[in-house]
Every structure is written in C-alpha cells, then in structure tokens.
Amino acid sequence: FNITGIPRLSLVSVTQIAALAALCAVISILLCMVMEFSHSRFQMYLPNTYLRIAVGGVVIIALTLLVGTRDYNGAGVDVIVAALEKGKAHPEAFALKMLFTAITINTGFKGGEIVPTFFIGATFGCTAAGFLGLDPSFGAAIGLVALFCGVVNCPVASILLSYELFGGSGLVLFAVACGVSYMLSGYYGLYSSQKIMYSKTKPEYININAK
C-alpha cells in the first residue's frame, strides 16, 4: 500500500502514535468482547443452527438496507484501500463493521475475522488520526497494525506485517504502536484457544487462555 504522511522519528511523533495505539488497544478489547458476547447470546437464544443462520441473514439484509451501502458486507477491501491510500473513512465505519462482523460470523456464516479486523483498524485509525495530529493515511496504517496486534497478541508478527504491507519506512514507529497495543490490550483475543504463556507486565509465567 502507498501510504502518506509518515512522520520523522521524534518524541512528538512517538507520543502521537502511542496515543493512537492505546486507543486501538481499547477497540481491540471491545471487538473481542463483542464477538464473545454475540456468540454466546446467539447460541443461547437461537440454538437451532438453521434458524440462527436464517435470522442472521435477515438481520444483515435489514442492516444493509438501513445504512444504504454494501461497504460492510464481505471483506471490505475497497474501504481499507480508501482509508490507507486516500485517508478517507466514515467516522462510524469501524463500529458498523464490528456489528456486521459479529452478527455474520456468530450466526453461522463462514468467514474470517482477520480482514474485518484490518477494516476496523484502518477506518478507526484514519478517523482518530486527525484528532492526534497525524496524517489520516498513516493513521489508518497504524490502526490496522495496532488493532491486529491487540486481537491476536502477536507483536513480532504484527511488526513483520507492517513491513510486508507498508515497507520499511517508519518501521520503528509501527513497532512502537505494536508494543503499546500489545501491552494495553490485556489478555483478550479473538481465539479463546490461544495460550498466553507469559505476563505482559511482569516476568511471570502464567499459561492462560485468551479471554
């Protein structure tokens, strides 16, 4: 992706990026909680698989008609590209994608969580960047990587992802974002089977499953 507005490494830029990453950590916790809550509630109130899928389909169609766009159906790659390369995203896009994803996946439709996570991170970062004095395009890139790091608890993989998607320019800044998001996202994760072996805040072996 061709992103713009990568700042020089300085105390100001590090502070701005740390603030955005901290916000992304909060959003990552919220995403994990929404996914877990919706999964348990759909299983509880709609135990029949076929009925659950039917209800989910009707709800998604209704929501799509309500918002007046299909941007939140499917992977949403066009929206991700617009946020990264044009610095454009609707302020509510990240929340709507979170809602659409939770309903779609947890009512039984097949699909992954990772690309929707990219969507949520990129659109949130693009929107929040302006409040922190960052370029929206660069903010979208930071948001994508930081949110991904928060939900998968894999900082090294997230740094490598930033290099793969955006090249080596600003790699230290992406590393800062990943570090902050990882530290502040707690022990939440998209996958409850994930084992977190060590504490994020102290040198302690904990061996717990992600929440």
Q: Which residue stretches match the model-derived regions?
A:
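Alpha-helical transmembrane segments and immediately membrane-proximal extracytoplasmic
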Residues: 1-211
